[in-house]
């Protein structure tokens, strides 16, 4: 099971640029999502505090998105970005190291980027699958449902549901994905609801049914709730 950190994985794409969130259904967008979530007793105050939804997918091929998501598994966002920067430096002529380049790199070079042995194995498997033509392109992925992509991509080494959910939200712009295994999402809900403990993933999934068809936006606001609490803790000593 993969879990994110306390906040949305920055390198995957948090949509801070204020661009429109891509959707797969006409009429589902930022204004509709905000209005729907504002009616929730728990999320409503978060929406009011955070303001407009700024979730925007980054146009990447699933290969790149999955490698980036692997980097972000169970580490702080800054650490993941440092590892990815070292990986990019190994293929300076490309925007992102192509599968063939990754497969040609010795394991020591990938370990030198900071990736664990498990992450190196996962990245190599993703690259090999892409090089063989068995990883769907962005265009092909757009024709598959969320469930189909989760079933297909979790067959890859090291790729769990959370990893695919990050691709669905931040690369494909799917509007109704709630990553209940994500620490930041559950922590955001705990804070917003005033709970002593985080909800269990299955309980949050049940709670989140009321947020459909805007569960990706709900996740974004829950990440922001966790961010705001983290920021408040950092600023508290300075205010004393």
Model segments located where?
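N-terminal polyanion-binding entry modules of DNA glycosylases/AP lyases
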Residues: 2-4, 13-144, 206-240
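Short polybasic linear motifs
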Residues: 7
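C-terminal end-helix/capping segment
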Residues: 182-209, 240
